[in-house]
């Protein structure tokens, strides 16, 4: 499993904080960030890398998290969530089988961002009754 990270200009500093934290925690991290990219291009790059292996997860950071979330939900087979707290990050893995989260650098600070990333990557899909909802989401794109 690899954690794919990406950010636009407004999210780059926080992305580096999260990336370094995940590396310290022992995760393989793939950074697809390129200078000058818009959040649309960054989100598409993260999703492309996430979709190479069904175990991969993605984190996109921009100023508010909303833009990358809108992009991610347009990608066939991608379940994504915009999160700003640890519980939501954890639960979106467990109940929605989300493979990507988006975070706003102007919404959360460094420590919260690290906790969000940790909760997300350590979350496991519960399956069962939640699969009906995941199937419904996957039929939409």
From Swiss-Prot:
It catalyses: aldehydo-D-galactose 6-phosphate = keto-D-tagatose 6-phosphate. The keyword Isomerase applies. InterPro entries: LacA, RpiB_LacA_LacB, RpiB_LacA_LacB_sf. GO terms for biological process: D-allose catabolic process; galactose catabolic process; lactose catabolic process via tagatose-6-phosphate; pentose-phosphate shunt, non-oxidative branch. Its EC number is 5.3.1.26. Induction: By lactose or galactose. The operon consists of lacABCDFEGX. It is an enzyme of class 5 (isomerase). It holds the Pfam family LacAB_rpiB. This is Galactose-6-phosphate isomerase subunit LacA. Pathway: Carbohydrate metabolism; D-galactose 6-phosphate degradation; D-tagatose 6-phosphate from D-galactose 6-phosphate: step 1/1.
């Amino acid at each position: 499993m690899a954690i794919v990270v990406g950010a636009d200009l407004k999210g780059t500093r926080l992305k580096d904080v999260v990336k370094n934290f995940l590396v310290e925690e022992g995760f393989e991290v793939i950074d697809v960030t390129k200078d000058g990219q818009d959040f649309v291009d960054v989100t598409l790059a993260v999703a492309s890398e996430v979709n190479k292996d069904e175990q991969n997860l993605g984190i996109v950071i921009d100023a508010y998290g909303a833009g990358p979330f809108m992009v991610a939900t347009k990608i066939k087979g991608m379940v994504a969530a915009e999160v700003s707290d640890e519980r939501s990050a954890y639960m979106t893995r467990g109940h929605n089988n989300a493979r990507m989260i988006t975070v706003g650098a102007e919404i959360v600070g460094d420590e919260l961002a690290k906790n969000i990333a940790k909760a997300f990557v350590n979350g496991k899909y519960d399956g069962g009754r939640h699969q009906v909802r995941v199937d419904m989401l996957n039929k939409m794109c």
